[in-house]
Design a protein with these regions (language model features):
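Ribonuclease/tRNase effector modules and their secretory precursors
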Residues: 1-152
Length: 152
């Protein structure tokens, strides 16, 4: 699905097909070692979460995407302390957490949000707000403050 190895099979655009949890797991695994920058539509933002985000940054967002480059960036830095399945929680975290703030950092001139929660320790997802094409949140990076009691 992600890497169309058979050119005779017409590939559906990434923004049409929302990945299942199993497809997301495969996408993350392939992205960690791949060299291309593939994109994946991984979930929708529920209305309550969309309202919280709009109240914080003033922008409407509806969907969540991952780019393999952001996955590689998040996992290649040892200081990020990520577990193998951390990115599989991203949609649930965005839709349920109330700890959202505008980041001091921008990505490609777009505003970013820091979305923090506790999944066996504090984890932060830095999401770029892309208002084009109906409004998307895209992962920039992800990190844990500690892992297994260790501190940075």
């Amino acid at each position: 699905m992600f890497l169309n190895k058979d050119a005779s099979v017409k590939k559906e655009p990434w923004y049409i097909h929302q990945l299942t949890q199993n497809e997301l797991k495969v996408f993350v695994e392939e992205s960690r070692t791949g060299k291309t920058n593939d994109k994946a539509f991984i979930g929708t933002i529920i209305p309550d979460a969309a309202q919280r985000i709009e109240a914080i940054c003033g922008k409407k967002v509806k969907k969540i995407m991952l780019e393999s480059e952001a996955v590689r960036h998040s996992f290649k830095k040892a200081g990020h302390n990520l577990k193998d399945d951390d990115l599989l929680h991203i949609v649930d975290v965005i839709n349920t957490t109330k700890d959202i703030k505008v980041s001091d950092v921008t990505h490609q001139n777009n505003e970013c949000l820091e979305i923090c929660t506790n999944i066996s320790g504090e984890i932060t997802f830095v999401m770029e707000v892309r208002i084009h094409y109906g409004g998307w949140l895209a992962l920039v990076t992800c990190y844990r403050l500690n892992r297994g009691g260790a501190t940075l």
